[in-house]
């Protein structure tokens, strides 16, 4: 983990929320094959070339899972105050029906899941509540594979854990559509 912390080109972009700029509450980095641009939260990310360590992780993961990943989003949670809000990884650049592999390194954190809100016109059911959500405690070295339907039906997020002082890295290997 120390090698990744030191060798990655970390950024803390700003996003527009209700007309105001806010720093993303974590550090991020985007790596991938040439042409694997990725837009989320209104930001366009150009891929940095794979480092040797990241390329080796990609190779090992691809062999183990029988999947071909061409991009990687890294999130660095410096302590328990860094977090990620509710979202689904459903951007049009992502290859449909391709799983996302999420590798956790460092401090344990709880990844929360809740049913994805449906448009009001389509849903006659009650809105999702906290009782409908669940958490997965992800420890150092855990690998979570989110198969394609996950993003269609669920949102996920990483809430703050304010007493936590240790760092956590999350590496999410993805497949971007190529032109």
Predicted features by range, described:
Residues 1-179:
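Non-heme Fe(II) oxygenase metal-center motifs and adjacent flexible, charged/small-residue loops
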């Amino acid at each position: 983990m120390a090698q990744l912390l030191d060798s990655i080109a970390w950024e803390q972009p700003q996003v527009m929320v209700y007309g105001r700029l806010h720093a993303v509450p974590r550090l991020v980095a985007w790596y991938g094959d040439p042409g694997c641009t990725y837009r989320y939260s209104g930001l366009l990310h150009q891929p940095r070339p794979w480092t040797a360590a990241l390329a080796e992780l990609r190779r090992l993961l691809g062999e183990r899972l029988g999947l071909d990943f061409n991009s990687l989003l890294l999130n660095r949670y410096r302590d328990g105050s860094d977090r990620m809000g509710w979202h689904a990884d459903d951007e049009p650049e992502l290859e449909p029906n391709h799983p996302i592999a999420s590798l956790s390194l460092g401090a344990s954190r709880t990844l929360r899941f809740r049913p994805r809100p449906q448009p009001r016109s389509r849903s006659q059911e009650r809105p999702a509540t906290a009782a409908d959500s669940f958490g997965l405690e992800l420890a150092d070295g855990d690998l979570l594979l989110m198969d394609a339907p996950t993003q269609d039906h669920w949102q996920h997020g990483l809430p703050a854990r304010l007493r936590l002082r240790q760092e956590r890295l999350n590496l999410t290997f993805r497949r971007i559509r190529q032109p």
